[in-house]
Amino acid sequence: DPQVPXYFIFGDSLYDNG
């Protein structure tokens, strides 16, 4: 997922919109 401030979840990075 793109590293953009969207939803703060444990994904590819701290900021993950997916």
Curated annotation (Swiss-Prot):
The active site is at residue 13. Keywords: Hydrolase, Lipid degradation, Lipid metabolism. It comes from the Eukaryota. One of its GO terms (molecular function) is carboxylesterase activity. Its EC number is 3.1.1.1. Seed. It catalyses: a carboxylic ester + H2O = an alcohol + a carboxylate + H(+). GO terms for biological process: lipid catabolic process. Implicated in the breakdown of oil body-stored lipids during post-germination. Belongs to the 'GDSL' lipolytic enzyme family. This is Seed fatty acyl-ester hydrolase. The lineage of its organism: Eukaryota, Viridiplantae, Streptophyta, Embryophyta, Tracheophyta.
